[in-house]
Amino acid sequence: MQITTLFTSKRILNLFATVFIIALLIAPTFSHVAQAATAKEIDVSVDVALDRFKNDVKGASEFLANAKGVLVIPNVIRVGFGLGGEYGEGALIVGGKTVDYYNTVAGSFGFQIGVQSKNIIIIFMEETALTKFRDSLGWRAGVDGSVALIDQGAGSSVDTDNLQHPIVGFIFGLKGLMVNLSLEGSKFTKLIK
């Protein structure tokens, strides 16, 4: 009588080979992440993301005009293959000027596969929320501050009169605001640039 097992050495070897090949295919996507962007490169990307935000989201200019501070993290790359992770670098703008640089890191587990790029804009509407963010050593969305995430879809307008939250967030891609996304668990940490 012969007993067969589900995990033979050949199957385990094939699994490792498959994971290795997928990692090799995905690695070029993150080559720019491994090389941290310069302050100038971040500033250029932030300007592009802000312009796209103003053009794609009706009411965006009002939000920006009333903001105490704006955190812009452009080109956040998210990769998932069972385990997922994302990374991006951006700038905090106060009074129309960049005052600090930040990165964001998040991880997740579950059914996910693929690569996605997105832009994150977090608008601090109250000075106390901005101060708490700037004073933190590593600020987590949903833990250190609650973010009202606007995800009404591309072409939608945002009513700034009825939205009274200290921190408002937007996630958008190439086609406008993205829906069904979250900032929960995303960590934002100040960079030295």
What are these regions (language model features)?
Residues 29-36:
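Sec/Tat signal peptide C-region and signal peptidase I cleavage site
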Residues 36-193:
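Small-residue-enriched, tightly packed secondary-structure blocks
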Residues 19-22, 70:
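Hydrophobic alpha-helical membrane-embedded or membrane-associated segments
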Residues 3-20, 29:
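Bacterial N-terminal signal peptides that target proteins for export
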